[in-house]
Amino acid sequence: MLLVHGFLGTRGTMMPLAKRFQDDGRTTFTYHHGTFQLRSLLSGAQELVEHIDRLQRTLGVERFDVVGFSMGGLIALQAVKFMQAHRAIRRLALLGAPTDGTWVGLLGVATMGLLSQSVWQCLPTSDFIADLRAAPLPPGLRVRQIHASQDALCPLPEPLEGIDRDHDFIVLPGGHSSLVVSHGFYRELKSFFEESHGDDARSPGGHDAEAAAE
């Protein structure tokens, strides 16, 4: 299990979530990908790919489950859509990821716009968000979007193309910080990663898509 933190976060922000996974017997990794994630999200995605590659070589593990929290979800999505990271990822959970962008980024532009490319990239009008939404999900990769209904930092987006709206677009009560500390959100993550492999037929290019094509 690999956890990817968000904007102005550090690996420490993911520790409550990491501890829950570890207590349930899952080997869980967090990692540092830039000071408070101020760099370009493209750089963050490349670093994620390199980190996964190092873990594969060090541990001898072929595939990982990944949770991308907030802007970390955009990083993970960039990695699987454009950098072939899906080859090393079994399932991806986007936890409060602003996949439609967020105007809260304007506050970041006012305070850190000269220092941080990422605050510009997460605006709803950015080319980064447009390209990220337009690119298809890789065939066979199961992705679940999990959101908080009162999340002021990440307003509820539309489901990504290829997401099963009935099963893999989850909205629960809470705010942005609830996503990594509330047991309800953890329960949804745990359920997603523990579902049987047969449930991956809902993924783009899965068995359901093949049956429809026939």
What do the PLM-derived regions correspond to, one by one?
Residues 1-7, 11-12, 21-137, 157:
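Serine-dependent carboxylesterase/thioesterase catalytic core
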